[in-house]
């Protein structure tokens, strides 16, 4: 009898699919309006976190995750560069304040420094890595077989909405011509 634990991301085969579908809808509108665009979803060559914070949608938490009021860390990010001006987002000054529940809940101490993740101590990192899991991590991993959401589930802004939320932010940039 095994009691295996999994993280929220593993529930669907492609947990980015709802976001990809929404971005596809937006791209179709841009195509009809003849607006040039380039989108990025979960692309390691694009740092969408910078645009997330500057858009005013939320902030980087002490867990290093991007947080929004009401949803906390439970969202996926995408960025669309467009050759069109949009109304500028109101930049709000969010923060975690004195909260450190993500750091306290991390079973391996991967979040001992605020706003920094030590990936060598992160269960999710090792369970998704193609490398051999270090011996010293095996006890901490225990019965988790696909990631660890302890830092996410402890985050107060996301306590009521532990699901994927689709948010769209527009940042005015000009696309280079190719």
Q: Language-model features: where?
A:
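Auxiliary alpha/beta "docking" domains used to position bulky ligands
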Residues: 1-95, 134, 143
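SIR2/sirtuin NAD+-dependent deacylase catalytic core
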Residues: 98
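Iron-sulfur cluster-binding cysteine motifs and their immediate structural context
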Residues: 101-131, 141-168
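Conserved small/polar residues in nucleotide/adenosyl-binding loops
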Residues: 171-177
């Amino acid at each position: 009898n095994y009691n295996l634990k999994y993280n929220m991301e593993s529930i669907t085969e492609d947990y980015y699919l709802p976001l990809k579908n929404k971005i596809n809808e937006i791209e179709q509108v841009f195509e009809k309006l003849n607006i040039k665009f380039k989108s990025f979803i979960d692309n390691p060559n694009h740092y969408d976190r910078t645009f997330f914070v500057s858009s005013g949608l939320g902030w980087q938490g002490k867990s290093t995750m991007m947080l929004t009021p009401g949803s906390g860390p439970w969202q996926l990010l995408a960025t669309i560069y467009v050759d069109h001006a949009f109304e500028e987002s109101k930049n709000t000054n969010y923060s975690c304040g004195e909260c450190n529940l993500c750091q306290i809940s991390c079973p391996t101490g991967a979040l001992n420094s605020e706003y920094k993740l030590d990936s060598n101590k992160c269960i999710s990192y090792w369970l998704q890595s193609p490398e051999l899991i270090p011996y010293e991590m095996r006890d901490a991993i225990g019965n988790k077989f696909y990631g660890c959401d302890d830092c996410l589930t402890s985050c107060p802004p996301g306590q009521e909405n532990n699901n994927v939320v689709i948010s769209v932010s527009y940042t005015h940039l000009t696309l280079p011509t190719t």
